């Protein structure tokens, strides 16, 4: 039940309007209308008294006749359809009266009903009664426009806009189009400017509403009013006060707010609670359910969704009212209705879009071709389309439906309008096309590929005779297009990298270049000079915009992570300027969210490898096509070899048929060739056509549209013959034979030429054509009707190639790189427009255009790629860098216009930015060097304002692009250096050469002429007059050095120009920012910067006559600026600076070197202020240049300066010095070896102070520092100037040892030994090859880091040739070891033995080298004797002492070092092995000393090591007499005897000299062999004696096992000696040498006897020592060994005694010249010498017990019997034998008996 207040709402709106209609109506004409109005008023009054029931209450009770109507009172009461018709009827009729005073209140009433929401429902003429009623209502309002009354136009617009904006009244379909068309007609037909503007604004607002709702899929989306001021055209802005704009804005705003005013109060009264919840509870009682999932969303989203559900409920109510029933499944119906809404909203948008496209294509009738109203309509439609596209949302951009509409309708509109001569239409067409490129390119790849050349490139490439306005429009739009950085990259990727597409980007750049360069000289042009200048400027702006766009895209990509999928970065959002405003409709949200921009059209993102492959493929294919268009055969061959075309004729034919860019004439020439391949290709080409079902002329048209028939008759004959064969094969029933088709084909071609050649005056008639072809069908005529129809078709439609349509385009823009000719389509338009049949053939043109689109889509790669990989930019730069460089360089060099200059400089900046980011060194350097040359700093006489601007650009480049310049920094810094040079020149400051030039150069400079001092400079003061001329004429940029050389003679006018130009430099500002800003560079850039600065500085300093230190001082500055960088980066920086300072520090120019070292000192002092943690090496790296310069510099002053600098740094920053100690000690180490005495004394003085006062600092952090300290002291010990310094250095080494022992040092427990450095002996570096001591305990031994370097240094000094130094070093070293060895652990002792002690004896241990012996034998005797004397002195003095001390150390610390016994024994054995009797004796004595001192220390295992060492020594020291038995000895002896004879015969013969030399060499070898044998024999005697001595000392401690090892060793010695003694040949040869050998005969008899004697003693003792209780097997072994040795001895004696006759016979054959010894006496002496051994042997056998003796008697008795028969040299043997027979053998024999 409604209240009276609610009931009166409708009547308050309707009643006054009806009363006014009644008042204004004429009773005679409009009596019916008046009566209807009164009836409605009465009905409303009656309804007010008895209101109709609400729809909710009457649903079940009402009959079908009382259907609810579209009218309601704004509350819950709804009027029936009949009541609604009753109320609407007078309003509709009033609108049809044609009287403004009647229409106006009716329209006003309708508008209020709509605005207040009293009308709800959908207006649709094809719908039900309710929809039809609403359509009639809206239609009546639209028809009011036909009245032509200006007063009615605004109410109509107001009503229609209210209807569209209404939420309750839904305008769709035809009704919507009717509304749009009405507003459109009002704009065109109204004569009131305000009404026109209002109509246009209303149209735009309607479009905003329709498309905004479509984007949101809801009719309830809030819509903001448009901003009218942004839509005003220049003509419409004639009202300066803006009243019209304000009026229209108020008109639109009020209508939009009226709807909100109706909705908001109702909504705010709902249960939602919040005023901001707009539509939240408007009609929620009938729609929103309690389980609504939108509770999870925020309030705004809920408001939107609730309003949408309310809208759905209205549809539901309408359907319920129409059908009178409810269905189950309400949720499903909701979904269906939502889809229906979406479909309707999209359908509305599509309808409006299509309608606008059609309106934009509407051509004026012929008779009114210049109709301004028609043009205004076209312009308005294009403007509306432009606005729609520029504000397109996500749905519009991605919907397939809209994409299809764009292709089908908008593209045709563009095709028609882009050729318009009216600039506004062309401008709008361009704007629409740019919007398509910016927002829709993903789905319009083929279309853009056609339109871009047609609209843009056609205009850009026309340089000589363009339409100025048209070209300026295109250039400005290109400039705006570049605002979106993604567009150009996508264009390049999808077209320039597409084989079947034109090189759009490349052609665009080249066209802009040609435009920027202007019309070529001598070419006719229609441009005026100001126009040409403006066009050049705009073209350069476009080029700059392109480069900027590329750089912006690159910046964006590098900041984003690499992704293989599309993301929001792919959004296309571009502002095309003030002419295309962003409307305040909320669509910016959709534009900003580009996640679906390419969701449907794009197939993926770009891949670097695929891009590279496609680009390379296209370039190579273009090269092949270009070659084909010059030489077809070679072109085909190239393409086949490149793999672009297959080798088969079929593949070649397919290429000729389908490829774009091929010259049609040359295709025909190639097909007509008679070569085998070309002929096969022609056959394959013709066979590829399918002529089935085609008329003959149609087949010829199809065949000939791909190429031009060649001019040669034979070629034509071959081609047409094959065509006739193919046609007859496809159509066998048309002609009797192929001959008929062949002849007819020729006739058709001739007819075509005759009919369409304007030069032919007398045209061929049909009868003539028929007559000419009689009897061609196998003697018969072809049917006349067939021939006549053929004639008609040929004469009406010319047979032509596709190329004919493009001929004009190709003439204008011949370009071999252009792959696609589709841009020539525009020429079709132009030609048709110029002709009279434009309108008649437009349909054909559109059809042809569609075919081209399809062909383009078929040929091109269908996938649209969104560029994401930055590698694409590399190819873009390669394609455009050269044109860009030319476009900017020429104007910059020639123009003085600052605008042009700044544009060019900006282009340079962006080009350098892009090339630097892409690391394209060559391209970047091309731009940078060009820009640097334009500064003209190398030629200051030519400096102008443009050069100053270039200098500023250089500075800006350094500031903004510094992170990417890499080695291009060199050019930047070169300019900075030259600028500063000129700046100082302008101030009159003296050049650096005044202070730093070398003396020689100064003297030469004084001789130079003085004509540089000119009157014009004298006003500037004496400084400037003196130095200004040095910077005048420098030559070219490349040839000029930064140091500069003397210039040529300077004229006065040049100098005047220089002075004025130098004043220009004041504009540039402070250059120091380049260096102060270096701290902002990234880690890689600062390194490049430093490298470049060092290189520039080197160039400055290289000049001997005019050196400069500007960059050198800046190096110090930037080092200060960047010293706070992380150490990793600073280390890389210093690596560059270090090499630089080393080079400068070693400069021949002493002043510069001193300056460099002082600069380095400043940096080092600054750096040492920073603390350094342990184990870092930065300080050492920083100070390394001092070390290198100290070593390399030849200047005493520099070396002294370095010493003082280093001492100052270290002593003043001693608390912070850590790793810097290393470099410091290396400097002083180098100084210790200096050739100048003062440097040595100065450096030692400083070292003395450091060690005395700061010694704890040396060892507190770095482990190797102490090593360097020791090396330094060792170096001073080796100095050659002062023995006092040497001894003091050794004393400091002792001091260091004392400090170590006292434990005053901070032990770096966390450090690890890093090995020796400096001059530690190489042996110490190789001593630990096994690697054992590097692991385990050593790492944790703190003493190792300090003791080892100290001891290694002392060890090195033991080699010093000066005895004082050598003795002191050994004394200190061993005193240190003795006194502090108890502090050492085993690992440290191992290191000490291996790397300190053993290296002292390295020469001894490693000198057993046969090659060394041979070399020494070959040398002269005199020199060798002197060396050996010195050598022996060192051996006796040093080795004896050192070896004894080593043994004593080992014994003293045996408890710790016992694992080293084996190594010590090997050292002693190495001495014994030495083929030097004295050294071997030293080794044996040390061995015995070791054994004697080690009383009771050795275990069984250690004793085994000892006896094994003795065995090894015995084995390796056996005397070698093999030389005397060799063939070499025999041969040399014979040659020596021959030489002696010859020398006796011919005293002066030349051969005597040769013989003497041979004799000398023989004697040398002989002497060496004898000496070696004697030495080894003596050593072995000493060795067996030492063994006996050791045995006697430790017999109780030696086990049988160890004793047997000794027996084995001595037995080997005895056997070897006996072998020598029993060799009669050897003995005879030794005897032949006479007293030379000084050896008895036999030579080793004593050694043999003593060896056997000791063996018998050892074995007897083993047998006798029963206390040891050896095992039975071991005892048997000992007895067996004893018996065997006894047998050996007896056998040897018996053999010796019985060999007299053999020796006598050999002696008789001896040479009479040889020395003879009576054998008898010698034999007796030998036997006498062997007698004691025989006696001992017999006695040893007697010591066997009875059982053993009896067991072995069988083998011994024969020897005893033979012994009786021997001749003895002594009676001792006989006595001992008698005793044995009597005491031992006799009892056994008697027992056997």
UniProtKB/Swiss-Prot annotation:
Activates the ARF proteins by exchanging bound GDP for free GTP. Plays a role in vesicular protein sorting. It is a peripheral membrane protein. It is found in: Cytoplasm, Cytosol; Membrane. Pfam families: BIG2_C (PF20252), DCB (PF16213), Mon2_C (PF16206), Sec7 (PF01369), Sec7-like_HDS (PF09324), Sec7-like_HUS (PF12783). Residues 55-66 have a biased composition (Low complexity). The keyword Protein biosynthesis does not apply. Keywords: Acetylation, Cytoplasm, Guanine-nucleotide releasing factor, Membrane, Phosphoprotein, Protein transport, Transport. Homodimer. Residues 284-294, 594-605, 1311-1327 have a biased composition (Polar residues). InterPro entries: ARM-type_fold, DCB_dom, Mon2/Sec7/BIG1-like_HDS, Mon2/Sec7/BIG1-like_HUS, Mon2_C, Sec7/BIG1-like_C, Sec7_C_sf, Sec7_dom. One of its GO terms (biological process) is Golgi to plasma membrane protein transport. Its main location: cytoplasm. It comes from the Eukaryota. Inhibited by brefeldin A. This is Brefeldin A-inhibited guanine nucleotide-exchange protein 2. The active site is at residue 712. The modification N-acetylalanine is found at residue 2. Residues 45-71, 266-299, 579-606, 1311-1333 are annotated as: Disordered. The keyword Translocase does not apply. It comes from Arabidopsis thaliana. Residues 270-281 have a biased composition (Gly residues). GO terms for molecular function: guanyl-nucleotide exchange factor activity. Residues 610-797 form the SEC7 domain. GO terms for cellular component: cytosol; membrane. The modification Phosphoserine is found at residue 595.
């Amino acid at each position: 039940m409604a209240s009276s207040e609610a009931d009166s709402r409708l009547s308050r709106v309707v009643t006054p309007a009806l009363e006014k209609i009644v008042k204004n109506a004429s009773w005679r004409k409009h009596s019916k209308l008046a009566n209807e109005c009164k009836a409605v008023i009465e009905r409303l009054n009656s309804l007010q008294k008895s209101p109709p029931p609400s729809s909710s209450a009457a649903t079940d009770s009402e009959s079908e006749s009382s259907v609810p109507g579209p009218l309601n009172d704004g509350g819950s009461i709804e009027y029936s359809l009949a009541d609604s018709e009753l109320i609407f009827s007078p309003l509709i009729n009033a609108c049809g009266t044609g009287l403004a005073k009647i229409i106006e209140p009716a329209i006003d009433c309708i508008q209020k009903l709509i605005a207040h929401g009293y009308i709800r429902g959908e207006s649709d003429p094809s719908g039900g009664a309710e929809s039809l009623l609403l359509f009639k209502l809206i239609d009546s309002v639209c028809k009011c426009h036909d009245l032509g009354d200006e007063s009615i136009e605004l109410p109509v617009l107001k009503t229609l806009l209210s209807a569209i904006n209404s939420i309750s009244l839904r305008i769709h379909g035809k009704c919507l189009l009717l509304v749009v068309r009405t507003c459109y007609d009002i704009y065109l037909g109204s004569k009131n400017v305000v009404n026109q503007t209002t109509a246009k604004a209303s149209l735009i607002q309607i479009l905003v509403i329709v498309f905004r709702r479509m984007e949101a899929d809801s009719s309830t989306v809030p819509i903001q009013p448009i901003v009218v001021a942004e839509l005003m055209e220049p003509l419409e802005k004639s009202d300066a006060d803006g009243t019209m704009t304000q009026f229209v804005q108020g008109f639109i705003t009020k209508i939009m707010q009226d709807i909100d005013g109706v909705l908001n109060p109702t909504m705010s009264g709902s249960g939602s609670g919040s005023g901001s919840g707009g539509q939240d509870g408007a009609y929620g009682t009938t729609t929103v359910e309690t389980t609504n999932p939108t509770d999870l969303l925020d309030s705004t989203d809920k408001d939107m969704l609730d309003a949408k559900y309310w809208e759905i409920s209205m549809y539901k109510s309408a359907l319920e009212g129409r059908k009178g029933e409810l269905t189950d499944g309400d949720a499903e119906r909701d979904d269906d209705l939502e889809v229906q809404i979406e479909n309707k909203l999209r359908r509305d948008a599509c309808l409006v879009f299509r309608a606008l496209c059609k309106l934009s294509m509407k051509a004026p009738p012929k008779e009114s071709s210049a109709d301004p109203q028609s043009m205004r309509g076209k312009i308005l439609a294009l403007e509306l389309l432009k606005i729609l596209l520029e504000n397109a949302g996500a749905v519009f951009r991605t919907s397939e439906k809209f994409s299809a509409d764009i292709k089908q309708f908008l593209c045709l509109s563009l095709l028609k309008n882009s050729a318009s001569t009216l600039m506004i239409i062309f401008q709008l067409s361009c704007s629409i096309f740019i919007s398509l490129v910016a927002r829709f390119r993903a789905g319009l790849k083929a279309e853009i590929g056609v339109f871009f050349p047609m609209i843009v490139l056609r205009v850009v490439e026309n340089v000589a005779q363009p339409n100025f306005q048209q070209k300026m429009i295109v250039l400005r739009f290109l400039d705006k297009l570049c605002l979106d950085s993604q567009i150009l990259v996508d264009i390049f990727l999808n077209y320039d990298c597409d084989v079947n597409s034109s090189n759009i980007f490349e052609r665009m750049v080249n066209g802009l270049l040609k435009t920027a360069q202007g019309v070529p000289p001598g070419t006719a042009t229609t441009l005026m000079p100001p126009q040409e200048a403006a066009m050049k400027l705009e073209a350069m702006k476009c080029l700059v915009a392109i480069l900027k766009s590329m750089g912006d895209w690159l910046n964006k990509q590098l900041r984003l992570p690499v992704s293989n999928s599309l993301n929001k970065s792919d959004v296309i959002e571009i502002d095309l300027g003030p002419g295309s405003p962003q409307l305040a409709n909320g669509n910016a949200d959709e534009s900003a969210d580009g996640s679906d921009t390419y969701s449907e059209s794009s197939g993926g993102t770009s891949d670097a490898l695929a891009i590279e492959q496609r680009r390379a493929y296209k370039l190579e294919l273009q090269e092949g096509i270009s070659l084909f268009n010059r030489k077809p055969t070679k072109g085909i061959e190239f393409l086949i070899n490149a793999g672009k075309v297959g080798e088969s004729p079929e593949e070649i034919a397919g290429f000729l048929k389908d490829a774009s860019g091929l010259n049609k004439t040359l295709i025909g020439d190639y097909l007509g060739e008679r070569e085998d391949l070309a002929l096969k290709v022609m056959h394959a080409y013709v066979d590829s056509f399918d002529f089935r079902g085609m008329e003959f002329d149609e087949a010829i048209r199809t065949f000939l549209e791909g190429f031009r028939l060649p001019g040669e008759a034979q070629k034509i004959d071959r081609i047409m013959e094959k065509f006739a064969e193919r046609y007859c094969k496809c159509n066998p029933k048309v002609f009797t034979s192929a001959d008929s088709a062949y002849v007819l084909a020729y006739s058709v071609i001739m007819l075509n030429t005759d009919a369409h050649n304007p030069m032919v005056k007398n045209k061929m008639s049909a009868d003539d054509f028929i007559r000419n072809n009689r009897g061609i069908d196998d003697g018969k005529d072809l049917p006349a009707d067939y021939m006549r129809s053929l004639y008609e078709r040929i004469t009406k439609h010319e047979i032509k190639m596709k190329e004919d349509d493009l001929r004009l385009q190709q003439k204008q823009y011949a370009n071999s790189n252009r792959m696609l000719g589709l841009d020539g389509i525009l020429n079709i338009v132009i030609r048709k427009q110029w002709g009279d049949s434009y309108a008649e053939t437009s349909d054909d043109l559109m059809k042809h255009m569609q075919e081209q689109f399809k062909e383009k889509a078929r040929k091109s790669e269908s996938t649209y790629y969104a560029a994401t990989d930055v590698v694409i930019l590399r190819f873009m730069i390669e394609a455009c860098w050269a044109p860009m460089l030319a476009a900017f360089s020429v104007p910059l060099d020639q123009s003085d216009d600052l605008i042009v200059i700044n544009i060019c400089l900006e282009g340079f900046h962006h080009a350098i930015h892009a090339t630097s980011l892409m690391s394209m060194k060559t391209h970047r350097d091309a731009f940078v060097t060009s820009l640097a040359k334009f500064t003209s700093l190398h030629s200051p006489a030519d400096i102008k304002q443009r050069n100053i601007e270039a200098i500023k650009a250089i500075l800006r480049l350094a500031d903004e692009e510094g992170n990417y310049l890499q080695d291009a920094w060199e050019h930047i810094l070169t300019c900075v250096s030259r600028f500063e040079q000129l700046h100082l020149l302008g101030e009159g400051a003296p050049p650096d050469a005044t202070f730093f030039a070398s003396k020689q150069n100064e003297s030469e400079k004084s001789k130079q002429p003085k004509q540089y001092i000119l009157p014009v400079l004298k006003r500037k003061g004496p400084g400037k007059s003196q130095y200004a001329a040095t910077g005048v004429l420098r030559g070219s940029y490349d040839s000029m050095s930064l140091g500069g050389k003397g210039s040529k003679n300077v004229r006065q006018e040049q100098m005047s120009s220089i002075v004025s130009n130098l004043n220009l430099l004041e504009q540039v500002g402070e250059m120091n920012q380049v260096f102060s800003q270096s701290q902002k560079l990234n880690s890689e850039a600062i390194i490049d910067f430093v490298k470049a600065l060092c290189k520039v500085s080197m160039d400055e300093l290289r000049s001997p006559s005019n050196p400069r230190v500007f960059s050198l001082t800046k190096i110090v500055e930037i080092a200060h600026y960047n010293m706070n960088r992380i150490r990793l980066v600073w280390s890389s920086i210093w690596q560059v600076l270090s090499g630089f300072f080393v080079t400068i520090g070693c400069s021949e120019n002493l002043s510069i070197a001193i300056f460099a070292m002082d600069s380095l000192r400043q940096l080092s002092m600054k750096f040492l202020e920073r603390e350094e943690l342990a184990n870092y090496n930065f300080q050492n790296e920083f100070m390394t240049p001092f070390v290198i310069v100290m070593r390399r510099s030849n200047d005493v002053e520099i070396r002294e300066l370095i010493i003082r600098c280093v001492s100052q740094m270290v002593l003043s920053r001693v608390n912070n010095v850590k790793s810097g100690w290393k470099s410091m000690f290396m400097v002083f180490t180098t100084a210790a070896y200096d050739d100048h005495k003062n440097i040595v004394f100065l450096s030692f003085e400083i070292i003395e102070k450091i060690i005395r006062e700061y010694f704890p600092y040396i060892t507190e952090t770095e482990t190797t520092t102490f090593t360097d300290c020791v090396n330094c002291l060792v170096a001073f010990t080796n100095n050659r100037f002062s023995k006092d310094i040497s001894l003091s250095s050794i004393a400091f080494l002792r001091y260091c040892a004392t400090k170590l022992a006292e434990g005053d040092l901070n032990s770096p427990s966390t450090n690890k030994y890093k090995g020796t450095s400096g001059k530690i002996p190489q042996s110490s570096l190789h001593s630990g090859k096994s690697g054992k001591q590097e692991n385990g305990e050593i790492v944790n031994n703190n003493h190792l880091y300090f003791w080892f370097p100290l001891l290694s240094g002392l060890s090195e000094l033991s080699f010093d040739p000066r005895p004082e130094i050598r003795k002191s070093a050994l004394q200190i070293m061993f005193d240190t070891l003795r006194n502090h060895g108890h502090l050492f652990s085993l690992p440290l002792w191992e290191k000490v033995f291996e790397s300190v002690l053993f290296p002292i004896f390295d020469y001894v241990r490693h000198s057993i080298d046969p090659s060394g012996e041979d070399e020494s034998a070959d040398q002269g005797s005199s020199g060798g004797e002197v060396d050996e004397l010195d050598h022996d002195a060192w051996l006796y003095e040093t080795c004896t002492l050192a070896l004894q001390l080593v043994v004593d150390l080992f014994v003293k610390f045996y408890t710790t070092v016992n694992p080293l016994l084996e190594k010590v024994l090997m050292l002693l054995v190495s001495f014994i092995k030495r083929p030097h009797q004295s050294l071997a004796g030293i080794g044996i004595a040390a061995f015995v000393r070791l054994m004697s001192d080690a009383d009771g220390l050795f275990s069984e295992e250690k004793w085994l090591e000892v006896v094994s060492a003795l065995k090894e020594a015995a084995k390796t020291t056996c005397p070698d007499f093999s030389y005397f038995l060799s063939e070499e000895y025999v041969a040399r002896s014979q040659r020596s005897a021959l030489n002696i004879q010859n020398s006796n015969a011919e005293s002066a013969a030349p051969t005597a000299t040769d013989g003497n030399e041979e004799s000398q060499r023989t004697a040398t070898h002989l002497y060496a062999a004898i000496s070696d044998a004697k030495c080894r024999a003596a050593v072995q005697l000493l060795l067996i004696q030492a063994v006996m001595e050791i045995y006697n000392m430790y017999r109780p401690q030696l086990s049988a096992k160890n004793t047997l090892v000794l027996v084995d060793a001595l037995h080997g010695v005895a056997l070897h000696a006996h072998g020598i003694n029993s060799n009669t040949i050897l003995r005879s040869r030794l005897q032949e040498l006479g007293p030379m050998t000084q050896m008895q005969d036999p030579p080793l008899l004593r050694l043999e006897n003593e060896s056997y004697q000791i063996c018998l003693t050892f074995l007897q003792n083993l047998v006798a020592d029963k206390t040891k209780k050896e095992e039975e097997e071991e005892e048997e072994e000992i007895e067996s060994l004893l018996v065997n040795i006894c047998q050996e001895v007896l056998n040897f004696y018996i053999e010796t005694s019985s060999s007299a006759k053999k020796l006598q016979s050999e002696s008789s054959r001896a040479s009479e010249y040889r020395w003879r010894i009576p054998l008898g006496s010698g034999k007796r002496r030998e036997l006498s010498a062997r007698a004691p051994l025989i006696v001992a042997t017999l006695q040893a056998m007697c010591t066997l017990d009875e059982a053993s003796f009896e067991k072995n008697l069988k083998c011994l008795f024969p020897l005893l019997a033979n012994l009786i028969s021997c001749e003895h040299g002594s009676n001792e043997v006989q006595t001992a034998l008698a005793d044995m027979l009597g005491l031992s053998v006799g009892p056994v024999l008697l027992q056997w008996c």
